[in-house]
Amino acid sequence: MRAHSTVLMKKTIKIYDDFSSLSSLVDVGGGTGTALAIIIAKYPHINGVNFDLPEVVQNAPSYHGIKYIGGDMFVEVPKGDAILLKCILHNWSDEKCIKLLKNCYEALPNKGKLIVMDSILPINLQTNVHAKYAVGMDVIMSAKLEGKERTKDEFETLATKAGFAKFKIISYVYGLWIMEFIKSV
């Protein structure tokens, strides 16, 4: 995942400039901090929190501007101006996603945003590379885990059930869509 995060995030910071307005960013399920380190290298004013299981963060390398916190995202999520969920929601059932999203909602200030990066399944049969990737990932997630890939409408439903006021799709980067769930408008 480290190599995937490096390639993905280097492209993401070129096309998604909303990180510039943040003073703090929490990467939930951030592994060893690769994605957050790339963001903070471009935006050094951001106070980064890399949040993952205790056994993951205890062995993470030290990056400037990143604090590591171990915990369980289904119990509580650290507070921040924004929260990043990259390739996380597709691992879990709708029920677990709603629990996680509610925890993220509680950790955000008014007008805070959750930045979600995940595949979006097409509604109609498509043969383009984006659709093939999403469908292939859906088969893998369904077979190996309790998760699944979701359509735009399914993501919007999860956001609404967790309390978010607004859902929008921002851009596409290497197989993943950048989405924002806004706490209040």
Residue positions per predicted region:
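C-terminal alpha-helical "lid/dimerization" subdomain adjacent to the S-adenosyl-L-methionine
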Residues: 117-162
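Core SAM-dependent methyltransferase catalytic element
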Residues: 163-185
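Conserved adenosyl
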Residues: 1-117, 121-128, 176-177
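Repeat-unit-sized solenoid/scaffold elements
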Residues: 7, 153, 182-185
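Short polybasic/polar patches that bind polyanions
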Residues: 62, 160, 165
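Short, flexible active-site loop motifs that bind/organize anionic cofactors or intermediates
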Residues: 87, 145, 168
